[in-house]
Every structure is written in structure tokens, then in C-alpha cells.
Amino acid sequence: MRKKERYEKILAWFRENRPVAETELHYETPFQLLIAVILSAQCTDKRVNMIVPPLYRDFPTPEVLAASTPEVIYEYIRSVSYPNNKAKHLVGMAQMLVKDFNSEVPDTLEELVKLPGVGRKTANVIQSVVFNKAAMAVDTHVFRVSHRLGLVSDACTTRVSYTHLRAHE
């Protein structure tokens, strides 16, 4: 089977069996999902789901989180990986949402990746789950499976894999 045929079969399966992007992360608002996805980097969704309820309760809006400090946020997220950096990113992200985006989570890749702590993968999760846009969060797992299916080559990085996979949508 040729590569293009493999792409088409796989995409057809996902369209039929997984028509709506979902996540295991617990959230009720786009802002909460953004927090959870930032925290999920190098951490399990299970761990993130354990720690976010008090964070969501005490920092329900970008304005409230933006008024906090990384030191305060650290105490809420100390059990995730890289809590110092993530605390700084969360406060910075909230401040930028308030200052530049009227406290709303933006819906474009270009705007999302401007936020502290938000890379392409996080931006793509937000786009697909919150805004139902055709976006693919390529991480090492997607990259590995794509390689095993023969959809990308050994030499590809996750970013190149993303480009290759998007080309066949």
C-alpha cells in the first residue's frame, strides 16, 4: 500500500471513529484547558487532574491568575514536573491574556504560541479541542506511531512530521 493510501485509510478511520477531538484533562473553560495543557508537558494527565481543582477554584479567571505570583502558583503545582518554570509561564500567560487578548484564549496558532509556556503542541491541542479546528498535536508518541506506520521517515523531527501529516488531511 502506498503512503498516500495509508494516510487516507488512517484519516478515514479517525473521521469515523473519533470525529471530535477529546482530552483526558479535566476542564470547564478554554482558560482552564490552557492551564491544564501547559501543566501536562512532561507530566501525566492523571497528575495534572489531581492538582488542578484548587488551582481552578482559586484562580478562575485570567485576571485573578495574572494578579498572582509564580511563588504562590508554585505551591499549587509543586507536584508536576518543572513547577518553577510552569508557575512563571502560567502567570505570564494570564498577564498576556489580560493585556493583549481581552482575557480570552486566542484561537489562532500564531497568537497562541506567543503566550508563555505555549508551544505548537499546546496550541494545536487548544485549537482542536476548544475551537474544533483541524489541528494535530504531534508529540513523541504521534511521531513514533507515524514512523511505524510508514507515514514519516526516520530523519523527520516532530515539527517536520506535523507538516507531513497535515499535508495529507
How would you describe each model-predicted region?
Residues 2-166:
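Catalytic cores of DNA base-excision repair glycosylases
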